[in-house]
């Protein structure tokens, strides 16, 4: 493999050197291709290289922003480094913006005595309620992963059994809608969806299938293949959680992992640390799952509080598939659209 890589590097170096492209960028691009097994057609090769070079500049800029904000956030070359910003949004984010409408059910605020008694750190992964990180692929189905993650947690807490549930069941079969300002926001597979709609589908459908019986394909199927004999979990209702991060922590401890929506545009090159740079809390374009919270010391701050957020971009992204979001500042709108199913 090393011999092949060296040969490709030599050929590529001769090709791009005539165009005045720095050798360092050439080397980085070839290392990127090797690490992430990227294959391009002849026509696509230079286009991807140009995007990669542009993204190197963006990564440098993001790291400077993090330093200026005394943030622990780290950005770097990852598997998305050959995608333009528009491609990243189209492939991996949700084109159904999450909006908290007045007709959605909302849970009560928790008792102050209970809130004051919750632990300083809590993680449902260590308690067995969280399945391994999944990968939505180039399909805007994040909403389905956020939903299944929540229901998986609720089912575990209720039945003491962790069952991986089928996102594809939702992608193919869920066409529920909610209304906002006279317009319909419907679940449309890879074209986006919302967790409240998905909960309603599961309730009306009498359950959701297991992952093993209805595996994920990263594309919207031409038909629904639901089989009631393979139901993995059922729910009876759902509720939104008040827009309050202290209350959110209480509900995580008392009820389980929470489905949320957030602004993830700046997550493209995230590789680690606590995300704490400016983003848009009013543009909720990605569905994810909060599984716990904690705090850490950084070079800038002691006891930095953060949320532990499970993503659906594979375990080779971020912190082994997770992102840590600064807690207490409504980072990226983390508290604006929070929900949980009810068994």
UniProtKB/Swiss-Prot annotation:
Signal peptide residues on this chain, from the entry's feature table: 1-18
PANTHER family in the record: CYSTEINE PROTEASE FAMILY C1-RELATED
Annotated protein name in UniProt: Cysteine proteinase 1
Single GO MF annotation: cysteine-type endopeptidase activity
Native source species: Dictyostelium discoideum
Keywords, in A-Z order: Disulfide bond, Glycoprotein, Hydrolase, Lysosome, Phosphoprotein, Protease, Signal, Thiol protease, Zymogen
Modification after translation, per record: Phosphoglycosylated, contains GlcNAc-alpha-1-P-Ser residues.
Function, in words: Cysteine proteinases 1 and 2 are believed to participate in the breakdown of protein during differentiation of Dictyostelium as a response to starvation.
GO BP terms, alphabetized: hyperosmotic response; proteolysis involved in protein catabolic process
């Amino acid at each position: 493999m090393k011999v092949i890589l060296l040969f490709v590097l030599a050929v590529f170096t001769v090709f791009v050197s005539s165009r005045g492209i720095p050798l360092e960028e050439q080397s980085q691009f070839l290392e990127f291709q090797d690490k992430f097994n990227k294959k391009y057609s002849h026509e696509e090769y230079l286009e991807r290289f140009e995007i990669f070079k542009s993204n190197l500049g963006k990564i440098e800029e993001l790291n400077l922003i993090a330093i200026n904000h005394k943030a622990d956030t780290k950005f770097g070359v990852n598997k998305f480094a050959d995608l333009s910003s528009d491609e990243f949004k189209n492939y991996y984010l949700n084109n159904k913006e999450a909006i908290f409408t007045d007709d959605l059910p909302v849970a009560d605020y928790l008792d102050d005595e209970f809130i004051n008694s919750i632990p300083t750190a809590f993680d449902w992964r260590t308690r067995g309620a969280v399945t391994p990180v999944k990968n939505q692929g180039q399909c805007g189905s994040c909403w389905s992963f956020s939903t299944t993650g929540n229901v998986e947690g609720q089912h575990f807490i209720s039945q003491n059994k962790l069952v991986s549930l089928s996102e594809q069941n939702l992608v193919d079969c869920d066409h529920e809608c909610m209304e906002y300002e006279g317009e319909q926001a419907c679940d449309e597979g890879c074209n986006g969806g919302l967790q409240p709609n998905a909960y309603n589908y599961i309730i009306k459908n009498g359950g959701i299938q297991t992952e093993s019986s209805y595996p994920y394909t990263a594309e919207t199927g031409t038909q629904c293949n639901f089989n009631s004999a393979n139901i993995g979990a059922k729910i009876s209702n759902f509720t939104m959680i008040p827009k309050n991060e202290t209350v959110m922590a209480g509900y995580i401890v008392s009820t389980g992992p929470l489905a949320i929506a957030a602004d993830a545009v700046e997550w493209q090159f995230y590789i680690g640390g606590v995300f704490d740079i400016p983003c848009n809390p009013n543009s909720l374009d990605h569905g994810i799952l909060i599984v716990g919270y904690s705090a850490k010391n950084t070079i800038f701050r002691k006891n930095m509080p953060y949320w532990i957020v499970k993503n659906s971009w594979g375990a080779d992204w971020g912190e082994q598939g997770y992102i840590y979001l600064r807690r207490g500042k409504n980072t990226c709108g983390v508290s604006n659209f929070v929900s949980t199913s009810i068994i």
